[in-house]
Amino acid sequence: MDISRAEQRILHHLAQGGRIEIKREGKTIAEIRCFTRDGWVYPGVDLELFRKLKRKRAIRSSSGRPYRITERGLYLVRSELDNR
């Protein structure tokens, strides 16, 4: 299954230890933020992209914690060199 460039970027951040946090107002999602492993906010996540990743089962949350990458997400993301 192919994933878009934006999905690949987000999954790569999550694979390196990042997380996606959501804030709700009632039952609706008010805000979505993607944090890198260093604590910086990555601006490339919107509601549509978040729902695509959930639909593909690439991310998951358990017990109300932030969303993390799943094994399926690791399979979908192509490896990239980390220039650190």
Curated annotation (Swiss-Prot):
Superkingdom in the source lineage: Bacteria
Q: Cross-referenced NCBIfam families, in alphabetical order?
A: PRK13687.1
Task: Show the HAMAP family listed in the entry.
Answer: UPF0386
What family classification does the UniProt entry report for this protein? Belongs to the UPF0386 family.
The identity of this protein, by name, is: UPF0386 protein NGR_c10980
Q: Which organism is it from?
A: Sinorhizobium fredii (strain NBRC 101917 / NGR234)
